[in-house]
Amino acid sequence: MITRKQYPNHHVYETEIGGRAFTVETGKVAELADAECICRYGDTVVLTTVTCNPIPKAGIDYFPLTIEFEERMYSVGRIPGSFNRREGKPSERGILNSRIIDRPMRPLFDEELRNDTVVTCTVLANDYDNPVEIVASLGASIAIACSDVPWNGPVATTNVAHLNGKYIINPSSDERDAADCFVCISSTFEKLVMIETEAKEAPENIVYECIRVAHEANMEIVKFINSIVAEIGKPKFTFEKAAVNHELLDDLMAYGLGKIEYALDTPDKNVREERLTAARLDFQEKFGEKYEDFDTHIEVCLYKMQKKVVKKWLLQGKRVDGRGMDEIRPLDAEVGVLPRVHGSGLFSRGQTQVLSICTLNTLSAAQKIDTIYPEDTKRYIHHYNFPAYSTGEARAARSTSRREIGHGALAEKALLPVIPSVEEFPYAIRVVSEVLSSNGSTSQASICGSTLALMDAGVPIKRPVAGISCGLISDQETGEWRTFTDIQGVEDFHGEMDFKVAGTTEGITAIQMDLKNKGLTMEIIADALERCRKARLEILSEVMLKAIPAPRPEVSEYAPKMLSLKIPVDKIREVIGSGGKTIQKICADTGAKVDIDDDGSVFISAVDSAAAYAAKKMVDDICFVPEVGKLYYGKVVRILPIGAFVEIAPGHDGMVHISKLENHRVEKVEDVLNLGDMTWVKFMGFDEKGRANFSRKDALKEMANQ
């Protein structure tokens, strides 16, 4: 006898988000995971699981948290396009979604937790209209909050779009694309912990309001999650925090805090590192024999000493390099720094330096995307490379990191609103940003460098884009806080916020905010937005526009020459020809490449303009349709007893009947026209068989009356 499996811990919870039902189901699947839930929003469904190793990992000084965002092609009813028809490594957007989940959650874990923790979000169904990253983020928050892993959550995540004067919660893909401002916000009940923004030069007040609306929606979601935790949440396990030799720390503070202050008090990163190394050697000589565990604890002690100094100085309005709180490091911008490439820009901000290179190609070079999202091609691509030498490290090159993918996507998002349409500029565009030197804010430097490279390449961008970052330091006991402009490496490392804002003179195009504290108030957000606005305008006017005031009028001589035109859809077959013979002949005769879309868009590329225009003329000739009543100048290509055939365009001829040759009776066609003669004719229309009929007589009469 078979017994039916029971699910005694099965629970279903439901709330409403953005006017649509959001359902959470637990206790039915993945029973061996520490916690799990299936979240459904419309027809988007995500399974989230949490597993945690009960034994702490030895020999590390960080919390080993891993967020896995698993895309499944069956979720959209498709089979993967790979050779073995299996999902491979995560897509770029999948990696970005895992970062969206990771970034708001990580600061809320105890930094001294050492247990391997893995959160896996598997997309089971995706309807495109209900954002999968939101469902996964909420599922991760619910699963961790209900697990026994210590965490200071929950957090909620909401998308908001500003479209036609309205603020839409969790917009569909179409609404997101049409919106002038789109934000993804994660927050606890009290504070914001993550901001992602993409906008079409939106003013700061619109961005601020989007953030506020999202935070209000998140507050209600946090209440909902807390109600679930109250019913089924597990008690959190206790753990032994990483031991710190407080006696050693006290001795170091008393003896060496002044040495740390001296080491940090310089604008030069190399000098700072040399001084810190000297201080460490001095400490080892002084206390190495006294404390047997000196080597075990010295790095933690040095970190705490540096953090104390940086925090004290910043709260006092002092920075390690002597700048004011709103002062930007020395800037420099150059264009045309490389030969042969289509466009290049070198942007330097203090000891941060980025070289960006722009490459133009035919639209067939656009990136093909095989994912669970609606987008299937990408015409504008930005790649960001962060080699070890940029920070002075001796480390071999490795595969592209998630950080590099994230920074590349941020720069891509920042510049996309100013990239011309395919009709205005029918090129595929790739920009690569090479970080040559890193001392903070390389992602924002890559945005500035990429703008320079695009303009140098002759890409007619709407307006230049610049990026700047803003930092934060606060005192949790007093509530005091200070923001500061253009953070450098040591301020990023010991500070609490990296608030990156990119935009033009007209408004914001992208924001990314990362935190190391427990969250921000809306007051801090408003302050950071205004601080970044002022700095952005200064960078554009004082440096970038002086390097290159406007995009170059022509693309590089080494770039392919592109033309675009539109033909009737019913003419596509004629242009392609039987088995592709016609289009192949066009390419062979001119040396150009011709691509045709299903909507009749034709894109022609060639190494020089003459070849491109020759191919365009051949396409125009094939698609030529005469207008009734219009005069045409053509060549006699054939003579019959009943009339002459006149070709008015390559491949387009028609008959002039003998009765239509002259105003008087004509006995013989050759009395008026001979083979090869040029003559004016008037198009009279097509007969029932689709044959063109011309009249020379009517053409001459009309010309005589003009």
Regions found by a protein language model. Give the residues of each.
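Long, basic N-terminal domains or extensions that often function
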Residues: I2-E240
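Extended amphipathic alpha-helical scaffolds
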Residues: I2-N53, D61, T238-P374, P560-E574, ...
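Glycine-rich, flexible beta-strand/loop modules in the N-terminal catalytic cores of phosphate-handling
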Residues: A21, A33-V118, V123-A125, N130, ...
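Conserved phosphate/anionic-ligand binding catalytic regions in large, soluble enzymes, centered on
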Residues: A35-C37, N130-D148, V335-C358, N439-V459, ...
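Flexible, glycine/charged-enriched surface loops at secondary-structure junctions
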Residues: E111-T117, N152-P154, I221-F239, N270, ...
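Mobile "lid/hinge" segments at catalytic clefts and subdomain interfaces of large enzymes
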Residues: D148-L264, L454-P553
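Long, charged amphipathic helices and adjacent flexible linkers at domain junctions
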Residues: P235-H246, E538-L565, Y613-Y633
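Single-stranded RNA-binding regions, centering on S1/OB-family and related RNA-binding modules
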Residues: Y558-M562, V569-Q706
